[in-house]
């Protein structure tokens, strides 16, 4: 199939080529210093050999005449410079550290070895692993822990202790503690003469010397006065003498301590009971 020579001259590529040729001859002098300021060779030099042909529209060129036309170096140079930058960009390639193409895509991730987890070694799926973990947690919640056992035991013991009926002595002790703050065993000790005096006063005038009056007079609890009056025990002659001697020695010890503090005068009777006489003799020599 033959084509008309006139129609080939009117093709778009031929028209553009002629326009570029005419414009480049007029603007060549003004374009050269701005386009290529660092070039040592003139732009329209005949020595420049371009290695690629004008191909702004390859599809239109293929449809035209297959006979090659003489290429003008200046025209192609200007056309190459005026092309948009998007036609000059080349496809970037990914390189890995060894220089292979698409190096990042060729590496495959190796699955991590979960050696410490027994669930992964059995080849179970994610659903089976979740079910196994949930079942293990439910079983752990069912088993009571040690601190829970201790708490339950203490709770049961306290409940049993509260329900247990108190003994007779516990009832009496609670009643005495509620009635008398000092209790039935007062810290203050009464001498044998004081005990005899309490009994004598209450026997002579019971209406005048009541329990409350005697408790206030001797500075003891009413329960102590009641027990003294209720008691029927009477010591023998020997027991009375022994109690009297012990009470006198107690009095002398207290007097000696007060004398050392300067609160009581020192006497010959109490001087032998002082701490100084225990550590040193009469000649102020230390005892061995």
Swiss-Prot record:
**Transit peptide (residue range):** 1-54
Major localisation? mitochondrion
| Record-linked InterPro entries | NGRN/Rrg9 (IPR010487)
Q: Which family does it belong to?
A: Belongs to the RRG9 family.
Q: Report biased composition (Basic and acidic residues) as residue ranges.
A: 112-168
Give the record's keywords alphabetically: Mitochondrion, Transit peptide
Q: Where in or outside the cell is it found?
A: Mitochondrion
Instruction: List the record's Gene Ontology CC terms alphabetically.
Output: mitochondrion; nucleus
* Protein name per its UniProtKB record: Required for respiratory growth protein 9, mitochondrial
Keyword hit for Mitochondrion: yes
User: Which one Pfam family would you cite for this protein?
Assistant: Neugrin
Which stretches of sequence are listed as region Disordered? Answer: 58-168
- From what organism does this protein derive? Penicillium rubens (strain ATCC 28089 / DSM 1075 / NRRL 1951 / Wisconsin 54-1255) (Penicillium chrysogenum)
Answer yes or no on keyword Cytoplasm: no
* Protein purpose: Required for respiratory activity and maintenance and expression of the mitochondrial genome.
């Amino acid at each position: 199939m033959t084509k008309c020579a006139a129609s080939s001259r009117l093709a778009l590529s031929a028209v553009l080529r002629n326009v570029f040729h005419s414009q480049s001859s007029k603007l060549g002098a003004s374009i050269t210093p701005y386009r290529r300021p660092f070039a040592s060779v003139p732009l329209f030099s005949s020595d420049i050999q371009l290695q690629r042909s004008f191909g702004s529209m390859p599809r239109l060129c293929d449809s035209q005449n297959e006979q090659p036309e003489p290429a003008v170096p200046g025209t192609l140079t200007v056309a190459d410079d005026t092309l948009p930058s998007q036609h000059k960009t080349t496809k970037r390639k990914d390189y890995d550290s060894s220089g292979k193409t698409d190096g990042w895509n060729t590496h495959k991730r190796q699955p991590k070895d979960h050696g410490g987890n027994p669930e992964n070694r059995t080849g179970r799926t994610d659903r089976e692993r979740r079910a196994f973990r949930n079942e293990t947690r439910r079983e752990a919640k069912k088993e009571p822990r040690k601190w829970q056992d201790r708490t339950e035991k203490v709770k049961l013991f306290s409940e049993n202790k509260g329900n247990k009926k108190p003994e007779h002595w516990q009832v009496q002790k609670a009643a005495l503690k509620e009635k008398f703050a000092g209790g039935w065993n007062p810290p203050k000790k009464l001498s044998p003469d004081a005990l005899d005096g309490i009994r004598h006063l209450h026997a002579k005038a019971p209406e005048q010397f009541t329990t409350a009056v005697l408790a206030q007079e001797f500075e003891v609890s009413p329960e102590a006065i009641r027990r003294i009056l209720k008691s029927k025990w009477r010591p023998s002659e020997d027991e009375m003498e022994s109690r009297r001697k012990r009470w006198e020695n107690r009095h002398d010890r207290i007097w000696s301590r007060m004398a050392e503090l300067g609160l009581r005068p020192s006497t010959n009777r109490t001087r032998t009971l002082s701490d100084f006489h225990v550590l040193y003799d009469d000649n102020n020599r230390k005892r061995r």
